[in-house]
């Protein structure tokens, strides 16, 4: 009501996309049997997979959805979730009083913090330009490639074997 009274829209901009098509680019039709209903997606995969599909789609074009696309997003979701669970586990006993100064950190921790900084700059730029799919891809690539496949693999032994008060473990 306040927006009606002020005679201004309750938003700054509107983002639209093309039609939603099947994964082969065909119009969905009950007679073709290629309809993917949001209710079915929610039942089988959950709301988070549907959200990832939306944000990962190129809204400049028609959106495609189907079994293979949803399976891929479910796999990405699982990988992102596992990465975040690993981070939460590694940080569960973190005490801010034991923070290590950046200059005292091992090189690999400085590298990963730089990657986080670069990622945050990209996310801000992509957000300002409504490049939502690029945000998703950058975050996924960072979590999957830089963290899970590289950094975590190197630092597992440090987390499990180094003494709790060592600089290496506290830097992780």
Spans of model-derived segments:
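Short, small-residue-biased leader/transition segments that mark boundaries at the very start
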Residues: 1-5
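Long, charged, mostly alpha-helical binding arms that flank functional sites
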Residues: 7-172
């Amino acid at each position: 009501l306040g927006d009606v009274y002020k005679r201004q829209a309750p938003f700054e901009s509107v983002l639209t996309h093309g039609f939603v098509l099947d994964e082969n680019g065909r119009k969905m039709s009950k007679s073709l049997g290629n309809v993917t209903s949001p209710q079915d997606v929610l039942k089988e995969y959950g709301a988070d997979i549907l959200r990832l599909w939306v944000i990962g789609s190129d809204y400049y074009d028609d959106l495609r959805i189907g079994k293979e696309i949803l399976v891929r997003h479910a796999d990405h979701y699982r990988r992102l979730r596992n990465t975040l669970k690993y981070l939460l586990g590694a940080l569960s006993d973190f005490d801010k009083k034991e923070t290590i100064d950046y200059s005292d950190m091992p090189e690999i921790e400085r590298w990963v913090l730089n990657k986080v900084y670069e990622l945050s700059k990209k996310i801000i730029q992509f957000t300002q330009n409504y490049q939502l799919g690029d945000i998703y891809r950058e975050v996924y690539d960072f979590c999957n490639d830089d963290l899970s496949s590289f950094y975590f693999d190197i630092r597992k032994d440090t987390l499990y074997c180094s003494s709790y008060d060592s600089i290496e473990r506290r830097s992780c």
